[in-house]
Design a protein with these regions (language model features):
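A short beta-strand-turn-helix
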Residues: 27-49
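Sec-dependent bacterial lipoprotein signal peptides
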Residues: 1-14
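Conserved redox-active cysteine motifs that mediate thiol-disulfide chemistry
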Residues: 53-70
Length: 154
């Protein structure tokens, strides 16, 4: 009985961490919770952008949602674009979880983003080239400013 529980725990941890190796975000436009299509993931309106990928089934994603929202507010005030992509699930749970991030949350019910783990934080430049990719949530960062510094933002 312990072996199946251990295996389930290992698989759950693997699903909530990890990273991909693509050097650019895809040139796709995902719908937003508010209705219109969002900007291309491969483009960035500012010098750097932060893209956060989360999933409704990920307990870590739920736990750190308030931190992500605070980080996005901080980055907005600093003039840095950010976006949250909610995916890796059916559209109902995606929309419900996306509501916590606001009407500009991007919905990926088609699996356009191929994240191996969530949450995932991707910093890109204006052209969409990946500068930094972090799987999981950084430990020890207790404020939006510390999180921004961890991701080399602003």
């Amino acid at each position: 009985m312990k072996a199946p529980l251990f295996l389930a725990a290992v698989l759950a941890l693997a699903a909530c961490g990890g990273s991909d190796t693509a050097s650019r975000l895809p040139d796709v436009r995902l719908p937003t919770l508010g209705g219109p299509q969002g900007p291309s993931l491969a483009a960035c309106a500012t010098e750097k952008c932060l893209t956060v990928i989360v999933a409704p089934w990920c307990s870590v994603c739920h736990t750190v949602t308030p931190d992500i929202v605070r980080l996005r507010r901080f980055l907005d005030k600093a003039g840095i674009s950010s976006r949250v992509v909610v995916g890796l699930a059916e559209i109902g749970p995606i929309k419900e979880f996306a509501a916590l991030y606001g009407s500009d949350a991007l919905l990926d019910d088609q699996g356009v983003i191929k994240a191996r783990g969530v949450p995932q934080f991707i910093v890109t430049n204006r052209a969409g080239d990946v500068i930094k990719r972090v799987g999981g949530f950084p430990r020890g960062a207790s404020s939006a400013e510390e999180l921004a510094a961890y991701f080399d933002l602003p």
